[in-house]
């Protein structure tokens, strides 16, 4: 399989492939970040616990160009609270959503606790490929398939993320320009990261990557 940069020509329908590769990272001390990727709070929680290492994207209503693009190799995880529903999650993670929903959703602030690096980006375009990834995500198969069926002529981007815990949570004001169904947000405030620690060790993370890629019939163990 060739490894192509974001925006590369789409492969024949039905063939999963790698479109971007970002170097792995270890425990490190970083300064600041102003780029964030929106995701349901319950999914961010699963990423933070190592229950999941992937996100799926095609785009949001307010996405620039209406299509999702992998614009940044690393970013803050921006937890969102709208549209989360128990029936869109597997039973194993419905209690976690119930816990999240019992807490008042912040309206005027955003708290960042996790930072992520894209390890690889895969593209898929078939329902059986989405179904094969089912063991690796917390959503129902029906919800994951709905991501695929939206704009069916475009492939679904599957981002494999190495997630890091920030040294301490950072809370910033929520601004009107952050609202809307878009994936990427430029945070006005420079968010200090401090020392970041991976939520999964190197061997455990690579094992999870191999499991995801193996489910799609891709070569494992090397990039």
Where are these regions (language model features)?
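Short, Lys/Arg-enriched N-terminal segments with co-localized hydrophobic residues
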Residues: 13-27
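Charged/polar low-complexity intrinsically disordered segments
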Residues: 3-4, 13-15, 86
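Intrinsically disordered, low-complexity segments enriched in Ser/Pro/Gly/Ala and basic residues
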Residues: 1-5, 20, 28
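Structured alpha/beta reader/binder surfaces that contact nucleic acids or chromatin modification marks
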Residues: 29-223
